[in-house]
């Protein structure tokens, strides 16, 4: 029996193909790691595998997230129109779609070295457990940070078969950044989450949310600056990184009054930060070769 057009649309929405921001936020640190690990242009086959892997795994993460939240999404204004909440897709379909996406990702990983294959099992584990953490801890954003950042050690493993200090500095820079921007995202849903009993850093940080987000952003910049110093990147890296800092200043102004629309706008702005840091790495790496 052929799949209807409505089902294809529901599956695409389950995978968030209509909202690419999450894919971009996962892609940027992956690109940082791929270029920084080799201090130049990564192998095109490895680059292609990781870009496709980002698309598949982000889609898988969205599907399992909606499956985990299928009983509460209908009670939250922002998520009430998701396919599982409306019945456009079934939980059984979501489970099979998740398995298919993880399988496709694993097929891609098999074209990498053993180092990356071993690390990929941790990636799947983190992607699977993250959606359920909001029921047990106020720190689900920390688990998202680990899940979104695990592409960094995988990139190093695939490229140089080693996980040097630089790799972990980049991982923790991304971890702090992810917790910061996902807290901004959680601020949008805070009232609904309090009502239905879902946990988040936005609830945990309470009236200190703005200050802690700013602190996390400072930590992100510190680690990125330290990477540039230890890796002896070209001065242009630090110039572009400074310009990226201005985006954090802008975000702090947006979330100051904790309005839903402004917090969501601040969250979306992080795409530009990730892109600017990527440009900073390109300048720092390639200008040094001139």
Swiss-Prot record:
Entry's Gene Ontology molecular function annotations: 4-hydroxybenzoate polyprenyltransferase activity
GO biological process: ubiquinone biosynthetic process
Its job: Catalyzes the prenylation of para-hydroxybenzoate (PHB) with an all-trans polyprenyl group. Mediates the second step in the final reaction sequence of ubiquinone-8 (UQ-8) biosynthesis, which is the condensation of the polyisoprenoid side chain with PHB, generating the first membrane-bound Q intermediate 3-octaprenyl-4-hydroxybenzoate.
Family named by the database record: Belongs to the UbiA prenyltransferase family.
Cofactor(s) required, per the database record: Mg(2+)
Keywords: Cell inner membrane, Cell membrane, Magnesium, Membrane, Transferase, Transmembrane, Transmembrane helix, Ubiquinone biosynthesis
Membrane topology, record value: Multi-pass membrane protein
Transmembrane segments: 21-41, 44-64, 84-104, 106-126, 142-162, 212-232, 235-255, 267-287
InterPro entries with a match to the protein in the record: HB_polyprenyltransferase-like, Prenyltransferase, UbiA_prenyltransferase, UbiA_prenylTrfase_CS, UbiA_sf
UniProt pathway: Cofactor biosynthesis; ubiquinone biosynthesis
Location of this chain's protein in the cell: Cell inner membrane
GO cellular component: plasma membrane
EC number: 2.5.1.39
Domain of life: Bacteria
Organism lineage: Bacteria, Pseudomonadati, Pseudomonadota, Gammaproteobacteria, Pasteurellales
Main localization, broad class: membrane
Keyword Transit peptide: no
The protein's name: 4-hydroxybenzoate octaprenyltransferase
CDD domains (UniProt xref): PT_UbiA_COQ2
Catalytic activity: all-trans-octaprenyl diphosphate + 4-hydroxybenzoate = 4-hydroxy-3-(all-trans-octaprenyl)benzoate + diphosphate
Keyword Transferase: yes
Gene name tied to this protein: ubiA
């Amino acid at each position: 029996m052929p799949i209807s057009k409505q089902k294809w649309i529901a599956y695409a929405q389950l995978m968030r193909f209509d909202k690419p921001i999450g894919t971009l936020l996962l892609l940027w640190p992956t690109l940082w790691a791929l270029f920084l690990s080799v201090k130049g242009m990564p192998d095109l086959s490895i680059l292609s595998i990781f870009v496709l892997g980002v698309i598949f795994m982000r889609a898988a993460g969205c599907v399992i997230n909606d499956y985990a939240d299928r009983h509460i999404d209908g009670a939250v204004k922002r998520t009430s129109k998701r396919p599982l909440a409306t019945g456009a897709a079934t939980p059984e379909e979501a489970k099979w779609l998740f398995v298919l996406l993880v399988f496709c990702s694993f097929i891609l990983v098999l074209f990498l070295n053993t180092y990356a294959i071993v690390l990929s099992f941790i990636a799947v584990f983190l992607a699977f457990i993250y959606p359920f953490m909001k029921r047990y801890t106020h720190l689900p954003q920390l688990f998202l940070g680990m899940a979104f950042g695990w592409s960094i050690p995988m990139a190093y493993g695939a490229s140089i078969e080693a996980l040097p200090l630089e790799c972990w500095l980049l991982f923790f820079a991304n971890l702090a950044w992810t917790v910061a921007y996902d807290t901004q995202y959680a601020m949008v849903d805070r009232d609904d989450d309090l009502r239905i009993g879902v946990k988040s850093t936005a609830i945990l940080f309470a009236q200190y949310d703005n200050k802690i987000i700013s602190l996390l952003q400072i930590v992100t910049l510190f680690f990125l600056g330290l990477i540039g110093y230890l890796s002896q990147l070209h001065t242009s890296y630090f110039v572009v990184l400074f310009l990226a800092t201005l985006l954090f200043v802008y975000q702090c102004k947006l979330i100051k009054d904790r309005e839903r629309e402004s917090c969501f706008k601040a969250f979306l702005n992080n795409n530009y930060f990730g892109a600017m840091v990527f440009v900073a790495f390109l300048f720092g790496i390639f200008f040094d070769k001139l």
